[in-house]
Amino acid sequence: MWDQKQLLPHFGETRAAIFAIKQIEYGGHDRPPLTIAVNASAYHAAWRTRCELDHSSSDRLQHRRNGRGESIRQHALAEASGIDPHQSRGQVYKLRKNLHILAVTKAGNRPVIEPRNRVVEVTCFGSPDGLRVVDAPLPTAGRGEVRVRVLASGLEYTDTLIRRHLYPQTASRRPPFIMGYDVVGEIDQLGHGVSGFQLGDRVADMTVLGSNAVYRTLQANQLTRVPAGVDAAEAATLILSWMTAYQLLHRAARVQRGQRVLVHGAAGAVGQALLVLGGMAGLQLWGAARGTHAGLVREFGATPIDYQHEDFTRFLPGGFDVVFDGIGEDGYRRSFAALNHGGLLCAYGYSAGVQDQQRMLTMLMWIARLYLWKWLPGGRRARFYSINAMRLQHPAWFREDLERLFALLAGGAIHPRVAERISLDEVAEAHRRLEAGGLEGKLVLCPDLFAGRDQRAA
């Protein structure tokens, strides 16, 4: 048995972390298996090249065994010496937390790799303490499906509603189940009957559940391509938050240039998207947010309203043409009162009711009441927007709108704000931060990140 060694490989620009070879015992088929710990970045790059063996590589890491030095070349990423493909085979059977498992077996001159899947699971409804990161079986793409390695999955306030059993679309689900509302991933397996995609393609989908994972399967006919060169975390912010904003503006409200629009929660992910896209549509914008976020609201071209100290119902004489409200303070009554004659309230959430511990039935009654307000005098209207309901009614719109947003991102016209990129083991804490509020931008899960390392903001 060999002492643990830390080996620093070449990773080019990625500068991935250190490999750790914990044990090396190898030889013939009757010898113990090889145990090697390899970090996620190295694994994924190795996967793309199928870990081709190359004994001519200059990037060798050698250990002392009969004076020999042998190597595996993993796409010029790293080499762990001592593995002779002609006489030995190994299997990674013991790894520390946060490391991917590789099963390395003899297959001619090409080892076979099996990745490790980890997921964020809801074990019971309630607080973030009910979230657990667990090992899960590696999914296999079925007919009409692809398997993706998850590059990014947005963390939404909606996730906290699902966890607390307050989200109508998942009301029938019971723990345990996997969290994750949306996904940007790289295809690494094609199911039977899938055409138009190939290994390595980057794709996106809104899944509602199941995407806080290292790997997952997706229906190929639901996927939207992610343009080359687009940052995966930024792309993930578009799938729910920016799609909600885009469809609120152009599908639900059908806004017109010059309209006066109030955005509640203007500093949040959806609020920021509404301000940016609303500005591009030529709207006059006001953003309700905490006073500490006034500068951010101005940055997006809107007039800030400190909702803690200013009455937005009296802020604009005559009232607003459109109000977007994802908070639902007092059951949307004040937002409705802030409209002018003929104005439209577009509600799309009820975070205030959640914070006040309201029951789901109460919040559903708030939504139902919106549709009765159109009979009140004053010509004002109200409606509730659901991204899932609109996708169900108009599936072509979803792909069309997401492709348009991806094109804007690829062209540099929009710059979604990623507040922080987090690891699987930090998801529970991320839920607490989402519930506390005050974030300027989106938290995005990047499964390749390790807990405890310095996180990267966009």
Residue ranges and their predicted role:
Residues 1-7, 36-38, 47, 59-73, ...:
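Hydrophobic helix segments
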Residues 114, 406-421, 428-458:
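C-terminal capping/lid region of NAD(P)-dependent oxidoreductase domains
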Residues 127-128, 136-184:
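N-terminal glycine-rich beta->alpha transition that marks the start or flank
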Residues 184-208:
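A glycine-/small-residue-rich N-terminal strand-loop-strand element
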Residues 198, 229-231, 254-259:
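Short helix-loop-beta connector
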Residues 242-309:
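Mid-domain Rossmann-like dinucleotide-binding core that forms the NAD(H)/NADP(H) cofactor-binding site
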Residues 315-322:
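A short acidic, Gly/Pro-enriched loop at the edge of an enzyme's catalytic core
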Residues 330-411, 447-458:
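Glycine-rich phosphate-binding loop and adjacent beta-alpha segment
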